[in-house]
Curated annotation (Swiss-Prot), chain B:
Induction: Induced by methanethiol, dimethylsulfoniopropionate (DMSP) and methylmercaptopropionic acid (MMPA). Belongs to the selenium-binding protein family. InterPro entries: Quino_amine_DH_bsu, Se-bd. The gene is mtoX. GO terms for cellular component: periplasmic space. Pathway: Organosulfur degradation. It catalyses: methanethiol + O2 + H2O = hydrogen sulfide + formaldehyde + H2O2 + H(+). Residues 1-24 form the signal peptide. Catalyzes the oxidation of methanethiol. This is Methanethiol oxidase. It is found in: Periplasm.
Length: 236, 436
């Protein structure tokens, strides 16, 4: 009888535990679909984004490998950083002042980064990479300082991982720029650097699936493309 | 770091894909590639070789336009590419460092480096596998740059050499990416035929309005017609049926066709305006000699309608190239058969009207204008087998000054006299575009 009572008691405790787990375990909030709903339309883009998964993203070319440095000065292979997650990659230099240049790229990344807080779980699949093409001035110390608002964000854990990277010099930088097709041009005074604003969408396998330039930097389109890739992976 | 708010962008900058569109291209140095708002320094002329003339090869000819230059108005360089390919059109890469050109007969694509020395382009790469890569597309015609890739329109196919064709996308390294076959009545691919439109599957030009995510393509004819002798074709009733009658609206981002408009008589060049609220495009029909407007209506739907005649359509002047002014107020329209250029006031795009005309020569095809509209350039060749014969076969580049009232000739380059060949598409170059 005691055994049966004990067994019943254990069963009751187990059942209560299960119920308790269901009550107390945080249920992940639903992610909006399409994900682009987290953004409002802007005057710059006067259209509705296509439905995610209603089109295919071509394999444009293989994203190149290269040696990069993170904000701690640790060297990584770019392929190691991009493999395994869908990556949005941008190229900037941190002393850029043209409003339609690097600050625009950064603004779009900040928008996507902030919005990712409302896209639970997306950070398991997607990340942001910003790579400097001015290693002389964008040293490890400089990118660490630049990245501070990102790394010190209290909600960083809920948002997309955003790595700010540099290189040790032109020799390491050149194959990355050439491989991506990121055109950079230094003027004779070496102070000003011209480049074409480009963002690259790289899939988990390391293929560039889309390239965005000025006029295409609608964050709704970026998220639609990301969602399309996720659906492709899921076999939808 | 503070995020910055951005208002409307000059997204229209990339809308048309014309060379001086690159001016407003993105930059961290304003501007990376400055628009040639001042003086264009060079003009590159993609030229067809002629049997028995000079080296008989297709070539990229460079003419000096620099004021005060000892060689202004003269050919200063020429790059021959081997053979006669039916050289036709070309387009710059989005970074404007390379000029992609096509041969409509051999389907070879020649990519020139125009940034290392803008006065002296060099052949950088040749693509010999266009037909095989694309799965049977023939006749690489328009080269429209997108970030990271080049969208090329076909004119024909290697199955029946008729007008059914596709768009073909390559990456900036010249590697094949994808083929998008034009919608046909049998396979609309989700597109809707508007009114009487019958999707013929034909292609010709491509232009986009990025702000609206709209891409438009037009329709011409296939290899069996464009390589046929013009006079012979005019007598061939069956051949004359094989011309395009459609403009297709596409979703630019997804590359999917959305609408097929009935635009009878072979609509050719398409041009979007520059204005940030200008939601329309023009095209002209070669056989029916009409100016067409493709526009967004009040309900946000795109429509197409004829808005003017060009000359007397019964004469079949054969409108060919067009050029829209930077201020969207005027449109040059050339007509091949009467050798005329006509200027239309398009300040109200729904009610355009002609305000000027001039005979350029016995035949005329291409027209390009400077950013300020004060200099207008014309060239002669349409197709090797369609150009006029004998003394009417004038082959040239002619430069004019336009003061708002009259075109006054500045200089002329006789391409036959110099043993070069048939002058076709023109595109401007400038060393100011590149810092290093």
């Amino acid at each position: 009888m005691r055994k049966r009572f004990l067994l019943s008691g254990l069963t009751l405790v187990a059942a209560a535990t299960v119920v308790g787990w269901q009550v107390w375990s945080p249920v992940p909030p639903a992610r909006p679909s399409p994900m682009s709903l987290v953004f409002e339309a802007s005057d710059a883009y006067q259209f509705d984004p296509p439905a995610p998964g209603s089109y295919r993203l071509n394999r444009i070319k293989r994203a190149p490998d290269g040696r990069v440095l993170d904000i701690a000065g640790t060297e990584h292979s770019l392929h190691d950083l991009t493999r395994g997650k869908i990556s949005l990659v941008s190229f900037v230099y941190l002393t850029c002042g043209d409003v339609n240049g690097c600050p625009l790229a950064m603004s779009v990344f900040f928008d996507v980064h902030d919005a990712s807080g409302d896209l639970p779980g997306l950070n398991e699949d997607v990340q942001l990479l910003t790579i400097s093409f001015d290693p002389a001035r964008d040293t490890v110390e400089a990118i660490e300082a630049f990245a501070y608002p990102i790394t010190s964000d209290e909600q960083a854990g809920d948002k997309l991982n955003w790595q700010v990277l540099t290189t040790s010099g032109p020799q390491e930088l050149r194959p990355i720029l050439d491989g991506y097709g990121q055109v950079v041009d230094r003027s004779e005074d070496q102070e000003t650097i011209s480049h074409l604003l480009r963002l690259f969408l790289v899939d988990r396998q390391g293929d560039i699936r889309n390239v965005y330039g000025l006029g295409f930097l609608d964050p709704r389109l970026l998220l639609t493309d990301i969602e399309t890739l996720l659906m492709e992976e899921a076999g939808a | 770091m503070k995020r910055r708010e951005f208002g409307a962008l000059a997204a229209g900058a990339l809308a048309m894909g014309l060379p001086f569109r690159a001016f407003a291209d993105e930059t961290c140095q304003s501007p990376y590639m400055p628009k040639i708002t001042g003086q264009e320094e060079f003009v590159y002329v993609w030229t067809l070789g002629v049997e028995g003339m000079g080296d008989e090869q297709d070539k990229l000819v460079t003419i000096d336009l620099r004021p005060g230059s000892a060689t202004r108005g003269q050919v200063i360089n020429s790059v021959s590419v081997g053979g006669r390919n039916e050289a036709h059109h070309g387009g710059f890469s989005a970074d404007r460092r390379f000029f992609w050109t096509g041969g409509l007969d051999t389907n070879r694509i020649f990519i020139f480096d125009v940034h290392s020395d803008p006065s002296n382009p060099k052949l950088h790469k040749t693509i010999d596998t266009f037909v095989k890569d694309s799965g049977g597309v023939v006749g690489p015609h328009t080269f429209f740059a997108l970030p990271g890739s080049m969208m090329i329109t076909g004119l024909s196919n290697d199955d029946d050499h008729g007008g059914r064709t596709a768009l073909v996308e390559y990456n900036d390294d010249g590697e094949y990416v994808a083929t998008y076959w034009m919608p046909t009545a049998d396979d609309m691919q989700g597109a809707v035929a508007v009114g009487d439109a019958v999707a013929d599957g034909y292609g010709y030009d491509i232009r986009a309005l990025i702000r609206k995510n709209v891409m438009l393509t037009s329709s011409f004819t296939g290899w069996s017609n464009y390589m046929m002798d013009f006079g012979q074709m005019l007598q061939d009733a069956e051949a004359m049926k094989r011309f395009g009658n459609t403009i297709v609206q596409w979703d630019l981002h997804t590359r999917q066709p959305k609408k097929v408009f009935n635009v009878p008589g072979a609509p050719l060049e398409i041009r979007f305006p520059w204005g940030s609220n200008a939601n329309y495009a023009f095209s002209t029909t070669a056989l029916t000699s009409q100016l067409w407007l493709i526009y967004e209506d009040d309900a946000g739907e795109w429509q197409a309608k004829a808005v003017a005649d060009i000359g007397n359509p019964a004469d079949i002047p054969l409108p060919v190239d067009i050029s829209i002014a930077a201020d969207d107020q005027t449109l040059w329209i050339n007509s091949f058969m009467d050798g005329k250029t006509r200027l239309f006031d398009i300040s109200d795009p729904h009610k355009p009207f002609q305000i000027y005309e001039k005979v350029i020569d016995r035949q005329v095809n291409m027209v390009s204008q400077s950013w300020d509209g004060k200099r207008v350039y014309f060239s002669s060749s349409l197709l090797a087998n369609w150009d006029k014969k004998g003394k009417d076969d004038a082959q040239y580049l002619k430069a004019y000054n336009w003061d708002g009232k009259e075109l006054v000739e500045d200089f002329a380059v006789d391409f036959y006299e110099l043993g070069l060949g048939r002058a076709h598409i023109m595109r401007f170059g400038s060393s100011a575009l590149y810092s290093s």
